[in-house]
Amino acid sequence: MMKKTTTELTTVAKGCAFALVLGVVLQFAACSKNNNINPSDEEILTKKIEDIIPQKYVDSLTKLGFTINKGTTPPNVDGAYLFKPFTIKNSNIPNDPYQPGYVLNDGLIKLYEQSTSDFSIKMLGKNFIGAADTSVVTAISGSGNKFTVYGKVKAYRNGGYNFYAFLMSGEKDGNNIKNGIAGIINIDDSHTGPNTIAEGQGRVAFDGDYTSGPTDFNSKTVGIAERNTFSSKPSQFK
């Protein structure tokens, strides 16, 4: 009789232990599923940025002096802005003719349709990368008045194409952007043509008077806005 009772108690104990383990597993699975269904703002933004530029290339640009403004509460930056004098800050391109202090053609950027729910934003540019560059995906981070815009651009040149990351940071100040700075870096040169910078190479340039004021942006000269197309003077910044 005692042996039977012990066996029954052991069976009950094993059953309770199994139920406890199963409950923990189900709870963990439910939490994981819930996180996938309702990701945090940080998770949404991090994923979007990772789809644009690998972290190693973010690190490369910051080593060249580019500033990343993190956060999920960027200011609204819709508008068109002029970078003048658009001045080279640094480069990691061997024998680059564009040395620090070199003044490029004026840079123009148009930012529009900024979203506070998924941190997307549309962007058009002149004199940043080259002709017929297409923005594949964009994102914006920041907090307070400071922000960073991230764009992935497919640029065609000399019979091939490359994917570049184009980043721009600054501080919104009324209708202006203060301390505007831009960086480009080649993130995929697997289909490149001749005379194009290699993967991992890039440049950083800034607004030399530290104030990028509002400007008229003639989209007819840079492509079709509905397709989120970039275009600028060829070969200026690549």
Can you describe what each PLM-predicted range is?
Residues 26-30:
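C-terminal motif of bacterial Sec signal peptides marking the signal peptidase cleavage site
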Residues 32-98, 213-238:
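Amphipathic/hydrophobic helical signal segments and adjacent flexible N-terminal regions
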Residues 82-91, 124-126, 148-156, 165-167, ...:
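Generic short beta-strand segments
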Residues 86-135:
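N-terminal glycine/threonine-rich, aromatic-flanked beta-hairpin/loop signature
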Residues 104-107, 131-136, 160-168, 180:
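Short, surface-exposed coil-to-beta transition loops
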Residues 163-238:
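Glycine-rich, aromatic-bearing surface loops/beta-hairpins
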